[in-house]
Amino acid sequence: MMTYFVFILSTVFVIGFVGFSSKPSPVYGGVGLIISGGVGCGIVMNFSGSFLGLMVFLIYLGGMMVVFGYTAAMAMELYPEVWISNKVVLGAFVSGLFMEMLLVLYVLKEGSVGSMFEFSSLGDWVVYDVEDSGFFSKEVVGISSLYSYGVWLVVVTGWSLFIAVVVIMEVTRGG
């Protein structure tokens, strides 16, 4: 039952991303991003990451609401464009939904999806010993794998955020 619940949440997550990537109007794009962020936090909470899910929900979505409020106020249109008002935007949205449905049917037919990475050195990570048995904390393992195996992701993300701040400063300055 929980597998289907996560599968439905993942589908809503991707549909929300398709909704805001087709960006008909900033208002609808922001709503799609907020829905996808909330559903992503629910997925994280389902996999026993309650602290991480709660922090992302409070910090990310709290910040998103502030940014969304300012951008929606600055880019407000008298007649905002919806997904069905432009044939190109509607075609992009429908083709994205079609690709998602093909992926859903493939996963349901095959029954599994492979993983790209295999983590063989789990002994290097933090193990909590309780009497004769030990266990890994999922949040500690996730953070340690992010900074060991995914250091390239941290570098690219940091650089992207830096460039985004520089671009925003140049746009608002008028240069």
Swiss-Prot record:
Gene that specifies this protein: MT-ND6
Subunit structure: Core subunit of respiratory chain NADH dehydrogenase (Complex I) which is composed of 45 different subunits.
Pfam families: Oxidored_q3
Similarity annotation: Belongs to the complex I subunit 6 family.
One GO cellular component, as annotated: mitochondrial inner membrane
Reaction(s) the record says it catalyses: a ubiquinone + NADH + 5 H(+)(in) = a ubiquinol + NAD(+) + 4 H(+)(out)
Membrane-spanning residues: 1-21, 27-47, 49-69, 88-108, 149-169
Biological processes, Gene Ontology terms: mitochondrial electron transport, NADH to ubiquinone; mitochondrial respiratory chain complex I assembly
Keyword Transmembrane in annotation: yes
Chief location bin: mitochondrion
PANTHER family: NADH UBIQUINONE OXIDOREDUCTASE SUBUNIT ND6, NADH-UBIQUINONE OXIDOREDUCTASE CHAIN 6
EC number(s) given by UniProt: 7.1.1.2
InterPro entries in UniProt: ComplexI_Subunit6, NADH_UbQ/plastoQ_OxRdtase_su6
Entry membrane topology: Multi-pass membrane protein
Function text: Core subunit of the mitochondrial membrane respiratory chain NADH dehydrogenase (Complex I) which catalyzes electron transfer from NADH through the respiratory chain, using ubiquinone as an electron acceptor. Essential for the catalytic activity and assembly of complex I.
One term of GO molecular function: NADH dehydrogenase (ubiquinone) activity
Origin superkingdom: Eukaryota
Name under which the protein is recorded: NADH-ubiquinone oxidoreductase chain 6
UniProt organism field: Pteropus dasymallus (Ryukyu flying fox)
Cellular compartments annotated: Mitochondrion inner membrane
Keywords: Electron transport, Membrane, Mitochondrion, Mitochondrion inner membrane, NAD, Respiratory chain, Translocase, Transmembrane, Transmembrane helix, Transport
